[in-house]
Amino acid sequence: MSRVAKAPVVIPAGVEVKLNGQDISIKGKNGELSRKIHDAVEVKQADNALTFAPREGFVDGWAQAGTTRALLNAMVIGVTEGFTKKLQLVGVGYRAAVKGNVVNLSLGFSHPVDHALPAGITAECPSQTEIVLKGADKQVIGQVAAELRAYRRPEPYKGKGVRYADEVVRTKEAKKK
């Protein structure tokens, strides 16, 4: 059995937590995030920590409590420090630019690709082949990064495409004659 749920989530100074039944909202310097907690989980706020326990009558209570703890910990980190995700564009003529809340991509198609960013997410391009996404919500940042990568996934022969900065693309050998 995993023991993730047994560890409390420490609430740092400057973070405000509101528990209202199964709804929780966490507010910090980077914004406010809210989430509905699973019915199998009971969350208690004591001192500067959130504790988790399963409710009676649920088979997967500890599993849901561990998941809830991980999600709320990510919310606390998001509103205090925030999350970043870096993408790289590999390929001749592949470029990225940010205009307002729209990421413009040139990925070898006959048309440029414009991707609108959701609220709470900002993007910047330190160079034409790099995109840095920043925001408080870890799930939304990962989703936006996956959507940008899906326009041109790294191909296995030359490795061209949009990849995560820490991604290792395994390349295949070309066909022998």
Curated annotation (Swiss-Prot):
This protein binds to the 23S rRNA, and is important in its secondary structure. It is located near the subunit interface in the base of the L7/L12 stalk, and near the tRNA binding site of the peptidyltransferase center. The gene is rplF. This is Large ribosomal subunit protein uL6. It holds the Pfam family Ribosomal_L6. Belongs to the universal ribosomal protein uL6 family. Gene3D superfamilies: Ribosomal protein L6, alpha-beta domain (3.90.930.12). Part of the 50S ribosomal subunit. GO terms for molecular function: rRNA binding; structural constituent of ribosome. InterPro entries: Ribosomal_uL6-like (IPR000702), Ribosomal_uL6-like_a/b-dom_sf (IPR036789), Ribosomal_uL6_a/b-dom (IPR020040), Ribosomal_uL6_bac-type (IPR019906), Ribosomal_uL6_CS (IPR002358). Keywords: Ribonucleoprotein, Ribosomal protein, RNA-binding, rRNA-binding. PANTHER family: 60S/50S RIBOSOMAL PROTEIN L6/L9, LARGE RIBOSOMAL SUBUNIT PROTEIN UL6M. One of its GO terms (biological process) is cytoplasmic translation. Coiled coil: none annotated. It comes from Pectobacterium carotovorum subsp. carotovorum (strain PC1). One of its GO terms (cellular component) is cytosolic large ribosomal subunit.
